[in-house]
């Protein structure tokens, strides 16, 4: 993926209108009251909330370090396991979506195929962002035994990379929910899984 793909994801204001017909039928503010919210839809939303929460924790953690509220050793002990959890689970989640759920959902509702292609392209862009994030984080962690100036420079570089990743992720998660949750509400998760057989 290129910087252009990065930019498209970051600049997108939401799904194209022609893919929002189910989202208009099932507005976000009504999801929790729908009978089909349990099961797959609820799991999807909880998983996405977890990614938002972990992303926020990483952003706040690097902010705490940069503001001097955490020492370098304390930050490293706190940061590394959370970053690994975030990156690993996000990548695994995207793989399950790309190879299991998206094909089943596109088969169940072919009019949304282009939406799943957009989400798949997002996953590739986000995966590259994950790799850049991990590289910047590792570079930062390596500087924790070096001069304070090098630590600050590396922390700033990581914070910039993290900000880009979190911005892409927020846009993608919202668009994915706007495409998938209304489909699940409309059809029910059992019908969607059964369509994959």
Predicted stretch roles:
Residues 1-197:
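Small-residue-biased structural context
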């Amino acid at each position: 993926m290129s910087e252009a793909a990065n930019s498209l994801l970051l600049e997108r204001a939401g799904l194209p209108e022609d893919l929002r017909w189910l989202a208009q039928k099932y507005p976000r503010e009504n999801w929790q009251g729908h009978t089909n919210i349990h099961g797959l839809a609820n799991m999807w939303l909880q998983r996405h909330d977890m990614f938002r929460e972990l992303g926020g924790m990483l952003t706040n953690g690097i902010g705490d370090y940069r503001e001097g509220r955490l020492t370098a050793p304390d930050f490293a002990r706190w940061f590394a396991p959370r970053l690994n959890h975030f990156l690993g689970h996000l990548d695994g989640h995207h793989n399950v979506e790309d190879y299991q759920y998206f094909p089943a959902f596109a088969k169940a509702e072919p009019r949304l195929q282009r939406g799943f292609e957009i989400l798949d392209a997002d996953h590739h862009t986000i995966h590259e962002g994950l790799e850049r994030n991990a590289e910047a984080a590792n570079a930062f962690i390596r500087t924790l035994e070096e001069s304070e100036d090098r630590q600050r420079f590396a922390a700033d570089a990581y914070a910039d990379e993290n900000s880009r990743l979190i911005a892409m992720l927020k846009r993608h998660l919202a668009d994915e929910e706007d495409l998938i949750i209304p489909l699940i509400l409309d059809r029910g998760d059992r019908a969607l899984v059964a369509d994959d057989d």
